[in-house]
Structure formats: C-alpha cells, structure tokens
A protein has these predicted regions:
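Generic structural signal for residues in well-ordered beta-strands
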Residues: 72-75, 458, 499-503
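Acidic, glycine-rich two-metal-ion catalytic cores of nucleic acid-processing enzymes
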Residues: 197-346, 401-465, 480-488
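Non-catalytic interaction-recognition regions
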Residues: 157, 309, 469-470
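Helical catalytic core of nucleic-acid polymerases
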Residues: 78-134, 141-154, 204-205, 221-224, ...
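Hydrophobic multi-pass inner-membrane translocation pores used for secretion
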Residues: 1-21, 25-35, 305, 313-317, ...
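Conserved DEDDh/DEDDy metal-dependent 3′-5′ exonuclease domain
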Residues: 2, 12-130, 135, 311
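C-terminal polymerase-core module
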Residues: 175-176, 185-230, 362-369, 376-383, ...
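Conserved "right-hand" nucleotidyltransferase catalytic core of DNA-directed polymerases
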Residues: 1-29, 118-288, 301-303, 386-390, ...
Length: 514
C-alpha cells in the first residue's frame, strides 16, 4: 500500500492536508481526500494497515507528526530519491536552501501541491523500474531519513550538569556577557608574556609574526609543525587551541542551544556526503570529542548498547569483488590474520597496511611492494578497486553496489585535472559508498525491530557505529545481530563474508567497555 501525503503546512501540532492512495507506478487508485488533522489520520493508518508514505521530504514533513505522537514505519522520500537520481544523470546538486538550525522550532514545509507530488513520484518510478538494487538504495535512504528525524527529535541522553562540570574544570567558571573563559584569558596573558608583547593566539598571522620576531621561521601553526619547535610558547599555544575549540564547539552556548530536557538534540543530515555517509548540522553530533562523552549517560534503568562494525570496508571489498581467498579471509573474526598468514608470513601489521593501502590508493614506497604481494594472493579484490581507479583517472563515473553514483569530474578535469587524485577518489568511493549502504540497511532493519517490541530507541549513528538506548540490552543485542544478518543477505546474498560487530553495554558512552 502506497499513500501520497501532502500537508498544507507542516507547522503546529496538527497539520491539515491531502492524501491519495497510488499504485506501484504512482497512478491514483482513488480520489484525493482532505484531512483537517493529518496526525490523527496517519496514526490510525499506522495502527491498522500502515502504508509506505510518499512525501516531498522527511526533514520538513515528518517533524510535525513526531510532535503529534505519530510515527511511521516506511516512507518514500522524494527529495533524497531525486538527489540520487540526479547525480546518476550528471545533474549538479542545487545548493541547499537556508535552514534555521535552531532546535525546537516549528519548521514549515515548503509548499507543494498534490499534482506535482504525484508527477514527481510517477517520474521516479519510471527511473527506478527494473533496477532492483537502485530501488533498494532508495528504500534504505528513505528509511534513513526517518531514523535521522526520530533520533534528532528523541535526542541522545546527555547530562547537562556533568557537562557543565567538565567545562568549569577545564575552562573555569562560565564568563559573563559571552566573554572568554578564565583559563583562555590566562593563557592569552602567559603567551603574550613569553613573546614579550600581547597577541591573539588564535590568529595564524600574529603567531607566525611573533615567532619571526624571535628569528624562527615557521611555515604554519599546525600542531605537528609547532610540536617540532623547542620554544616555551609551544605548549601554551597547543593548550590554547584545545581549550578554544572546546569553548567554541561544545561550550556553554552549545549546551544552551542543543541540550534540552536531558537530551542532546542535533540535526542529522542523511546522505550529505557524496558517498552516502551522514553529516550533522549545528550540534556537531558526528564530532563529539572524547572529553564530552562522559556526559552521555543512560537514563535510570537503561543502558547503551554500542555496536561498531570493525574492518567494515575490507569486508565490503571482499563481498563486492567475490575474490575467493579474500572472501574466506573475511569469514574470520579478524580479516587481517588470514591475509597475514597467506601472504605476509604472519605479519598482521603488513597485512593491514597492504589492505588499507589498496583501498585508499597508497601505492608508493613500502606500500607498493606490499601491494604486489597482495595482488598475487588476492588478484580479484585488488583488480576490483584498481578498475575503479582507472575509470576515475579517465574521468568516468563509478557506482556503489546499489547504484549510488560518484559526482562527475569538474569541467576543467580533462584539460588540467589531477587524474591520480581522481583515481584515488573513485577507488575508495565504490567501497566506502557500499559500506554506507550496508550500514544504512542495518540501521533501517534495526529501527523496525526495536519499534516492534519496544526494545529500545536508536540514539546515535555514525558511519559504522550504532547506539541503542534500552532497558533490555540482551533483546536489543539480539535485534542488532538479526539486522546485521538481514542487511548482509539483502545486499550480498549467501556470502561467506561476515560482518562481526564489536558490542559493548555501558551506562556511560565514554566509559571503558564492560
């Protein structure tokens, strides 16, 4: 069952709007129906015969339903599907519209009429017809938009009090009137004293000039460059950089803006990276520093089930290439161990360097010799990524397992582009994009399993890591394992390749694994 849903507005708790059931090709099966309360209508449908909702974009439409207590199982996100199809067609992605990223506001969906939504869906169905893998990608991407909206709405359990203690311990008491924290002010003074005059330690130009006055030519203020200097200002400058980053990125203003009611509520952006990986807006959800993870604390009676897919990209390469020996190696708990045993005399470190080198295009120096050895043992796996690299060097477009296309080279590539850089990009794209698809399929499957028996909530997702907040860790872990197996079969069929998840259960995200 498919139902097109077009709100008149997504603002408020109970938007009104139109719905119409359609067939697999997007043809209406009945007359359009207007609803004064779409939230109640959607909730009723989900309790009886849940359809796949077809709407303009989850990010703008779904929040109103979440606020009204209506959650949906499946949708077809026209915006994310259009983005996938446009890249495949070589159509440049338009710049994003300005979005108010402050959390908690009642966003208003862009206006759309029912006829245009029906026409868009019908066009997309034509483009997807007969392309089973691409249809799977679109379904997974749409499911990802639902998970992203729900995780942003529900939030990640976060102790504001613990975070304030971290800030005060590290930066000193909160400054008034948005001034600098005491520790940073103190460092400014100490750095000025070392150089004999006041300067702004955050200014690249002023720091270089200060060193130059002392007869020291420094090419940049990067950490690795500064660490090579024997100068009393260096440790102070490095400390200043760390404290300034904490203050500006996750300081008191960040806490006031993004943490409410004991939850960190970021804005996740599925498919924001060309490979299909996610990004985040405003709250920096995908970049929480280690020092702040101690503030991510499960609610009473709950724990976090934290799952990380180790060695994901090498295992994806094994499954994609079908290389018999690499597939066998990827059936082991540690993929590098059998690779080391068969090719590098048991040296696991060399095996890891070789495998990662072939994935990322490290083909010079020691890596070249290791690659030659790897090619002898795993010719099909090596040829798979090298074929993608050669295509990139020729300016061609390559695709993930399910059909996500990489962007074409820019207009000047054939005249003066860096063919080798393009080749390194396409070499990794085919694997990284497929890894993103696998992780997205796991996330989509797990989301439905958790909801079916109220076994927990998804609260964090980053590339190859998933975090569930739950009262029943055993059940959540079982659902996770089932989702991994399901996603693997869905993408690769009856493969020998295993995707073992490193699972830990913790009360605090930043604590040592139990």
């Amino acid at each position: 069952v498919r139902t097109v849903l077009v709100p008149d507005t997504a603002g408020g708790q109970s938007p009104d709007g139109w719905t119409v059931p359609v067939d697999a090709d997007g043809r209406p099966l009945a007359a359009a129906e207007h609803h004064d309360d779409l939230v109640t209508f959607v909730r009723t449908c989900e309790e009886t015969e849940p359809p796949r909702w077809i709407w303009t974009g989850t990010a703008s439409v779904y929040p109103a339903f979440l606020r009204g207590g209506a959650r949906v199982r499946r949708c077809h996100d026209l915006a994310s599907t259009r983005a996938i199809l446009n890249v495949r067609a070589g159509i440049p992605t338009p710049p994003e519209q300005s979005v108010d990223e402050r959390p908690g506001l009642f966003d208003v969906a862009p206006t759309a009429d029912l006829d245009s939504v029906l026409a868009e869906f019908a066009w997309q169905r034509v483009e997807l017809r007969g392309r089973a893998r691409l249809e799977l990608l679109v379904a997974a991407e749409s499911a990802g938009t639902l998970a992203a909206a729900e995780m942003g709405f529900d939030g990640l359990p976060f102790s504001a009090d613990t975070h304030r203690q971290v800030l005060e311990r590290t930066l000193g008491p909160r400054p008034v009137d948005d001034g600098l924290p005491p520790r940073i002010t103190e460092l400014n003074t100490r750095i000025g004293a070392v150089f004999g005059r006041a300067l702004n330690p955050a200014s690249h130009t002023e720091v270089l000039e200060a060193f130059r006055r002392e007869g020291i030519e420094v090419p940049s203020t990067r950490k690795r460059v500064l660490r090579e200097l024997d100068h009393p200002a260096v440790p102070l400058l490095l400390q200043h950089r760390d404290l300034s980053k904490l203050h500006s990125t996750n300081g008191w203003h960040w806490l006031d803006t993004w943490v409410r009611d004991g939850r960190f509520r970021p804005v996740y952006v599925p498919g924001a990276v060309v490979s299909g990986r996610w990004a985040s807006r405003g709250g920096g959800a995908l970049q929480i520093p280690k020092a702040l993870r101690s503030s991510v604390i499960a609610e009473p009676g709950h724990v976090f089930v934290i799952a990380d897919a180790g060695q994901l990209e090498p295992r994806i390469l094994a499954a994609m290439s079908g290389d018999p020996r690499m597939t066998t190696a990827a059936g082991a708990e540690d993929l590098y161990a059998p690779v080391a045993a068969t090719t590098f005399g048991g040296d696991r470190a060399k095996a890891k360097v070789a495998v990662l080198g072939v994935l990322y295009g490290a083909t010079s120096g020691e890596s070249r010799a290791l690659l030659t050895m790897l090619r002898r043992s795993f010719p099909e796996a090596v040829e798979f990524v090298e074929r993608a690299a050669r295509a990139g060097e020729r300016g061609e477009v390559v695709h993930s397992w399910l059909g996500r296309a990489c962007p074409p080279p820019d207009a000047g590539f054939f005249a003066h582009g860096d063919a080798r850089a393009r080749g390194r990009f396409t070499r990794n794209f085919v694997v990284q994009a497929t890894a993103a698809e696998w992780a997205l399929c796991v996330l989509a499957d797990l989301r439905l399993r958790l909801a079916a028996d109220d076994a927990g909530e998804l609260v964090f997702f980053q590339h190859d890591e998933i975090v569930v907040h739950t009262r029943t860790p055993e059940t959540a872990t079982a659902h996770l394992s089932a989702a991994v197996e399901s996603a693997t079969r869905l993408l690769f069929g009856a493969t020998e390749v295993r995707f073992p998840m490193q699972v830990s259960v913790r009360d605090c995200y930043g604590a040592d694994e139990s």
